[in-house]
Amino acid sequence: MKVVLFCGGSGMRLRGYSDDVPKPMVQIGTRPIMWHLMKYYAHFGHKDFILCLGYKGNCIKDYFLHYDESVSNNFVWSKGGKNVELLNRDMDDWTITFVETGANANIGQRLKAIEPYVQGEEMFLANYGDGLSDVPLPTMLDTFRKSNAIASLLLVQPTSSFDIVDAGPEGMVREIRPITRTDIWINGGFFAMRNDIFRHILPGEELVREPFQRLIDKQALLAHKYNGFWQCMDTFKDKQHLEELNQGSAPWKVWNCAANSSVDCNCPPLEQRKEQQIVVSAHV
């Protein structure tokens, strides 16, 4: 199954970290956040990636062209450094397609730009490239496959520290509660789409605006609510939180389940983690 990652954003609210690299290349630990996302998808069998490049796209190309497996894997060093034997690898069987989609393009334009690379696919996966989750992907895909929807998106509850204030007509406050304790759901940036999505995107349109509204009007947009772990990386505070998690439980690292049976996760049994038929369409 193909996975489209939108990698063209500049990360304006992460200035200082994203001055020299695109937002998806900002590191969590020793690897960029997009690497963590790709490991997540690969864990479930989806290892064919299409990267929608934009702002400083050459940084992403250079990273993979000079990828150093030793940074995140065990290895044996011998003969004074003349021999380095990797004991395991991150992406032996990954396929990555790099597509320039424009420095200032929006998500809808980037998606249209890669349409030729997903022709023939019935469905595909897509992701904003700046958020991590441990959502059980096969469950989300199974629900989508059984529906007549053209697209499905992950809904999560906001992780903001803001409070909701309920005030009466005269201004007297009736209740204050954390936004996380409300029935508010936001777009989590994880998508599954059928190829028909491209017929609903006109030139210049932002994906979640006009195209998704057309799907809503046709009752063809499916929501998958998930109240487990999800965290975006929009601000310095978000990055700091992800760094702290990376030092400990790192809930999004579902791939650790395969290496350590003692790790608790939301993964289905191995036999259910087969690659599923999901497709992405694009247009360069």
Summary of predicted features, one role per range:
Residues 3-5, 51, 126, 151-154, ...:
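Structural beta-sheet core signal
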Residues 60-168:
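Conserved beta-loop-beta/alpha segment of the NTase-like Rossmann-fold superfamily
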Residues 1, 47, 120-123, 219:
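Short coil/turn segments at beta-strand junctions that form active-site/ligand-binding loops
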Residues 33-36, 109-113, 211:
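Well-ordered alpha-helical segments embedded in enzymatic catalytic cores
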Residues 122-125, 132-145, 156-160, 172-267, ...:
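Catalytic-core segments of class I nucleotidyltransferases/pyrophosphorylases
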